[in-house]
Amino acid sequence: MTTQPAFIIDVRSPLEFAAGHLKGAINIPPDRIEQAIGAIDGLERTSPILLYCLSGARSAFACQVLAQRGFTQAKNGGAMATLLLNFERA
């Protein structure tokens, strides 16, 4: 198992998230990332953040948004299926 980053963000839709997600992940769809990111307790601009979705496209967009907002440790984890090789499913 890989050591989990401090924050795991699933940027899929709430329906996709409800169907299954990585253990410890929170759900913030890409169209809400700018508004919701500031409401996460303990999150700082230097906090490690792993974002993922179904294919990696939405998480790439969300990573770009966070980088533009000064989050220096936001990483695109890509596709959920790939991450399941190293992380637990909730």
Descriptions of predicted regions:
Residues 52:
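Short, surface-exposed ligand- or partner-binding patches at beta-edge/loop junctions that are enriched
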